[in-house]
Structure formats: C-alpha cells, structure tokens
Amino acid sequence: MMEKVAVVHYGEIGIKGKNREFFERKLIEAIKRATGMRVRRKYGRIEVEYREGLESRMAKIPGIRYFGVGFKTELNLESIKKAALSVLPESFKTFKVDTSRSNKNFPMNSVEVNRKVGAFIVEKTGKKVDLTNPDVTVWIEICEKEAYVYSKRYEGIGGLPVGVAGKVVALISGGIDSPVAAFMAMKRGCEVVAVHFFNQTMHSPKVREKIRMLAEKLAEYQGKIKLYMVPFKEVQFEIINRVPPKLRMVVYRRSMMRMANLIAEKEGCKAVVTGDSLSQVASQTLDNINVIYSASKLAVLPPLIGMDKEEIVAIAKRIETYEISILPYEDCCSFMVAQHPETRAKIEDVVKYEGFEELERKAVEESEILEVGS
C-alpha cells in the first residue's frame, strides 16, 4: 500500500550528537505548526502527511535542507517499482534512478536497486536512461521498515529550527537590511521578538502598516512574532535639543540599544540583532559601532556585518521582504542625519550628552505590542 508523504532531510541537526533529539523535536514542532499535518520522526529524516499546498509552507521552515514529495511504500522491490512508476511526470524523455540505502539488511545494494527499477521504467514507458542530465530523477530511500520514492524534490532554507538558540530582540527599521538580519537570526535557531521605534509626528498609520507587513512576512519563517511599536518622539526631541547634530545618530542608536535591552529583559531574550553592515553608512564604521554597541548589556549580533548591499538585496528578494521594504515612508532616523555626521565617535564625547533613561523606560512601557502571524 502506498501513502503520499513528504520526507524531510536536515543538515546540521544530524551532527548535534547528544542534542540531536532536542533539535529534531523543535523541527517537528515547527513543521506541525506550519502545516497542521501529522508528523513522524524517523532516524535521519522526518515524515510528513501530505496535503495540497504543503510545499510552499515547508520551504520556509528553518532547519529543513530539502524535502521530497512522493510515496511511502512497503520494503520490497515490487512495491518500490510500482511507486517509482507512479511518481513519474506525464511528459519526459530521459530519467535516472538514485537510491540511498540506510537499511543494510535490504537484499540489494543501491546500484542493484537503480538497475532493476530503471529497467522496469524503461520496459513500462520506453523512455531512455540519462545519468548525466536527465529530465527526471527518481529518488529511492531504503529505510528500516519502509521505502520512500519521489521525483519532486524541493530545497529548504537550511540552518537550524527556530528556538534552539534562544530568544533575541531584532531591531526592525523598515528598510531593506533589518528584516534580512532578523531572518538570518531565525535561520540560526533564534526566536525573534521584533522592535520598531517610530515617531508619532509623521505618517504613523502608513509606517505602522509597513512594519506590520514586514513582521507578517517574517512570521512565515518563525510562526507568531511579537512586535513592539515603541513611541520614540519624546526621546527623539530630547536628543535633538541636547546633542550636537554630528553626534545625534550615534546617541540615538545608543538609546535604541538601551530600550532594546529593557524589552529583552522583559521577554527573556539573550541578545540584540541589528541590520548593520560594516561601512555601509556613517553610523556603521568600526568606531561608531563600538560606541553604539557599548550601550548594550547584552551581546549585539549583526548577521549582515560582512555582506554588501547586493548580497543583502538578493536575500531580501528571496524571502519576499524587499518589495515591502522599498515602499516609501519617512523613518525616525531622518531627523538625526547630519550633513557631516561623526564617523569616529569616542565614548567620552557621547556619554556627556546622555541621561534620558527615564524617558526611554517610559517609551518602552507605552509600547504597543502586537502578535503577528499564525
């Protein structure tokens, strides 16, 4: 008897030793949450009950290296042949069979299975074998109690399941970089709490909607995301009144770090994630980054630090945040950008203008907190 399933393969999880079961369990939870389907843990793979549309959801789950959609069948050659014939597309000219065998007690090795199943397909269809550049590949996995046969294979996004590395606060500005940084943190096993600082004097409804759209897109990779909308107006005005123009951006970002730390403490987060890319803008020089990050008690993780803009844009397009990020809006940084900003800030020149922790605490307390995604 054949059952249509998806068979999931992972990469790094397989080398996690004693923690492997924990990582697998987290991935299974993510698959169940994303698909709503029955999931079974098999050694070295995960089996998912199939339903229409499963592929698009599975492709966005961190921790999956690739998955095949086909049939689970009984562990004998005749059943495998029948399944192989069933997974072939209607139109093709050439094919090959690719067998892997984790069950060494199966009476044939991988080469023999390839040869026998291939000969059966030739006999039944009249198609030709092409081992170099086939139109169709039939993958066969010989396991302990069953075999999996499929010709549709989909690449996942790799990485680790969300949550295995703990929780982080990710600063979301509304630009191209910060959503990509949040995604990269998710891909390394972090559960993201998103934080956006907004200025209520601007086009708040449009800004709010754009940030919500970005969070919803990111939620496709994580599941539900908690989004903090932090009112920044009072802190911003204090910085404008107190700080020389060339230092405002550095002071402003240090203030964001302190507020992010307050939220992290509340949410049980262990680090702050930023969209910084080294030397991309004035605030992202090594000197300025050192001064800005020193305001955080927690580790600050910049996943994009070594990427150029083209690399970041390519990921943004792949995860479908790019078109949202380029929607026009005024962000609260615009007030802070000086004509000649400081690129080599010194901590002693910055801290003497600070001292608005009460306003920062008040802003965090007055944050709007949204639950985004499903």
Swiss-Prot record:
GO molecular function: ATP binding; CCA tRNA nucleotidyltransferase activity; tRNA binding; tRNA-uracil-4 sulfurtransferase activity
Sequence positions that bind ATP: 171-172, 196-197, 253, 275, 284
Ranges of residues in domain THUMP: 52-153
Keyword check for Disulfide bond: no
Gene3D superfamilies, per database record: 3.30.2130.30, HUPs
Entry's family note: Belongs to the ThiI family.
Function statement: Catalyzes the ATP-dependent transfer of a sulfur to tRNA to produce 4-thiouridine in position 8 of tRNAs, which functions as a near-UV photosensor. Also catalyzes the transfer of sulfur to the sulfur carrier protein ThiS, forming ThiS-thiocarboxylate. This is a step in the synthesis of thiazole, in the thiamine biosynthesis pathway. The sulfur is donated as persulfide by IscS.
Protein name per the record: Probable tRNA sulfurtransferase
Organism field: Archaeoglobus fulgidus (strain ATCC 49558 / DSM 4304 / JCM 9628 / NBRC 100126 / VC-16)
